[in-house]
Amino acid sequence: MSAIMLRSGNVARSTILAGGPLIGGPMTFRSAVSSTRTFSLFTKARIQSDDMKRASLSLQPSVREAEKSQGPVVGSEGRGVEGPHYQDQVSHNVLSDASTTGAWTMFNPIYTEKELNTVQVVGRAPVTFGDKAAHRTVKFLRKCFDLLTGYTPYEVPASVLAQKPIPIAELRSKGKLLSDQKWLFRIILLESIAGVPGMVGGTLRHLRSMRLLKRDGGWIHSLLEEAENERMHLLTFMTIAQPGIFTRALVLAAQGVFYNAFFLTYLISPRIAHRFVGALEEEAVRTYTHCISDMEAGLIPEWKDMPAPAIAIDYWRLPASSSLLDVIRAVRADEATHRFVNHSLANLDQKRDFNPFALSEASPEERGSKWGYTREESAKFALEQQRKLMAASEKSSGLVE
């Protein structure tokens, strides 16, 4: 490489470090020849070494070596570790379909019928003290929530279901069934709270990334996706519900208390916070499974053949003929995903590991039938997805035949 000639040492130093192009045409070059300086390879190497000394603490070689000595991490540094670049993704003209309004700002889930049927009620047995504390807290909150909403996990006997007609009014009067309005009351309260953890975690990790002057490893985006997904659940059910003053007051009070409590929990122990959310989502899947069972058994006649709201058809890319039952099944699949992701994140090193789901989601079958990944499974999954992404990127750019 030919020597780089510039007007002054200061300009040369800043230009080399920035890696930017040389500015100026032939006239500028000729006028500078008599007063130029030539930098040898040794000088340029010294300039670059000086630059590392002035780097942020997290980028200095000694700090990076110390981090490596602590053991392996989930994920790795390098290209594509926090998700695909927009230029690496295959473009799709969603506006060609008149029934859609375009892509949503963040990831929005799309399921097949088979994938929706894979969702199961599963749970992770608590192991550590933190796990047990999170699990017991969720169980206590669940009991309080059931009492507030009048919910009873009652399974109607087959003999009662065989009656024509089914004594729905009698079952509701005995507190064994929820009416459509009580289901909406319960769901709206649940979803108004469920959108808090992702936003809290994303906010705190965003601030941590800026505070430490280092990248986050893909955690922020997944947590914000979770928060938006839960908010879309709330907006969907708001299209068929008209909350009164009492419901709005409860939402305001519950959200204010829960946000601050979860904020403090995440500051103290992100691991316990994610375990708490994983356990909370287990209960959400259980609740929606009960709701689906009641709808399929004809125990909520007000929702029979009710069409899916337009916002739900657009968000989940559902067929135009979809019903409210299809929407609730999609919501349950989302909750199973949050259960899977948060339990998996709780198993990671909260300060050093990369988010294994920054590159790609696990398969819907796994998300629906497993409580989550162990740390070893997360490391394997992250490596596999990074290799797939790199191979696809190289193939699309013509580097591989």
Curated annotation (Swiss-Prot):
Its cofactor is Fe cation. GO terms for cellular component: mitochondrial inner membrane. The chain crosses the membrane at residues 184-204, 249-269. Binds 2 iron ions per subunit. CDD domains: AOX (cd01053). It is found in: Mitochondrion inner membrane. The keyword Transmembrane applies. Pfam families: AOX (PF01786). One of its GO terms (molecular function) is alternative oxidase activity. Fe cation 2 binds at E230, E281, E335, H338. Fe cation 1 binds at E191, E230, H233, E335. GO terms for biological process: alternative respiration. Keywords: Electron transport, Iron, Membrane, Metal-binding, Mitochondrion, Mitochondrion inner membrane, Oxidoreductase, Respiratory chain, Transit peptide, Transmembrane, Transmembrane helix, Transport. Catalyzes cyanide-resistant oxygen consumption. May increase respiration when the cytochrome respiratory pathway is restricted, or in response to low temperatures. This is Alternative oxidase, mitochondrial.
